[in-house]
Amino acid sequence: MRLPTLRQLQYLTAVIDEKHFGRAAEKCHVTQSTLSAGIQDLEDLLEVGLLERTNRKVLTTPIGEEVADRARQILSLSDDLVDLAQAEKNPLAGRIRIGVIPTISPFLLPRVLPKIRKQLPELEVLLIEDQSERLLVQVENGTIDVAILAFPFNTRNLNYRVISQEPFWVALPRQHSLSKYESLQPHQLPINELLLLAEGHCMREHAISACQLPASAQRRSVQATSLYTLIEMVASGLGITLIPQMAINSDMVRHADICLRPLKQDSLAKREIGLVWRPSFRRTSTLEQLALSFAEAMDETSD
């Protein structure tokens, strides 16, 4: 029985991802005719149509979507085989793809990447920034190997390890009435002034939990797409927000015309930071070193 080749599966997923034969061919480093022939051979082998070809765009058939999903899993397992062999020869070398959420990446990566380069000089690190749920999907389908997330968050059947926790701080307009206090309790925060990130950002859920917001207040709250936007809105006097401790010494915050106050230490307004990876990802030495590097960087943000 003839089986699809990995190359054919790569061609198919590339076309579906790029939605364009030319860009897919460039991604696969082949000519467009070679890529088209490879996909045609795959369709002939499976005896189903995977793509609908028009003059303007590429459409995927329903069975094509299902085949592509399985193809990504197969390609991911194939990558894992190569990684496993690489880890046997040199556990701390090779390539690793890391996803990081937007409320961590700008504050932690500048600290942690120099550590990784120093401690793991033969490791090639590829980075992607995205929201938690989309990063989990990418870990599951093998697009990335590890995700750096904030918890609590449902990691489904993936492995995870918490490496640190950090408290939230309150960002206030400088003339706000709460600025006279050295620290604050969550119950002191005026709910009607609280600015939150939009749905899909896990820090939104953490802030809601920390402040024990009722559902009605959650719907009323202004929603922003980035922490930078929230900080600028606070500086303009439009409300207050919570920011993670790792952000308080960043240029974004230090140069903003705002007042920062910690939430009291006995408060539950904290988040945990950790790594998430597939059970089939066996490069334990690399994971251990990554966890150590990120934990060290987290410690530095609390100084």
Task: Tell where the protein language model's regions lie, with residue ranges.
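A short LG(V/I)-centered, amphipathic sequence patch enriched
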Residues: E43-T60
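Short helix-boundary/capping micro-motifs
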Residues: T13-T34
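Alpha-helical linker/hinge and terminal dimerization helices associated
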Residues: L45-L46, V67-K89, L290, F294
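Central regulatory/effector-binding core of bacterial HTH transcription factors
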Residues: A93-R156, A224
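Hydrophobic hinge/microswitch elements
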Residues: Q131-I144, L149-A150, G200-R261
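A late-sequence structural motif
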Residues: L108, C259-S302
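Secondary-structure junction motif
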Residues: E193-P214, R283-S293, A297-T301
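Beta-alpha-beta core module
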Residues: T155-V162, E166, Y181, Q188, ...
